[in-house]
Amino acid sequence: MSDYKVKFVDYPAQYKVHKKELDAAWQKVMEGGDFILREDVEKFEKNLAEYVGAKYAVGVNSGTDALMLTLKALGIGFNNEVITSSHTFWATIEAIENLGAKAVLIDSVDGLMVPEEVVPQITQLTRAIIPVHIAGAVCDMEFL
């Protein structure tokens, strides 16, 4: 147990709020064995696509895989550069480098990437920018 007075995320409290619904869903999936490329996944993907207004959605097992598939779909690979914040979870950099690309890190004072820091890092090898929003603050998405 940590000595922190304020928890970053209180998972037990969040679980208690949704316990009945989560437990029922978990039990249904586990008892049916329908959790890998089956009906429940198809329903999830369809519902997610509708929710975000997309034609398709793909369920994956982790945020790392989601980042890797997105970068791969964009054709990013060897000898490419992807700009992102140094204040990110390690999986962001792992996804970039697993495809053979180079992560170009922006080290901002407040953790948010701003045009003045990003523009000088853009080269002919730059293929993407992955913004990282920190503590409820949002990067300048119009610029990015």
In which residue ranges do the predicted regions lie?
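N-terminal "arm"/small-domain region of PLP-dependent enzymes with the aminotransferase-like
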Residues: M1-D34, E39
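Hydrophobic (often cysteine-bearing) scaffold residues that line and stabilize catalytic clefts
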Residues: H18, L22, F44, G63, ...
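PLP-dependent aminotransferase-like
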Residues: K72-L144
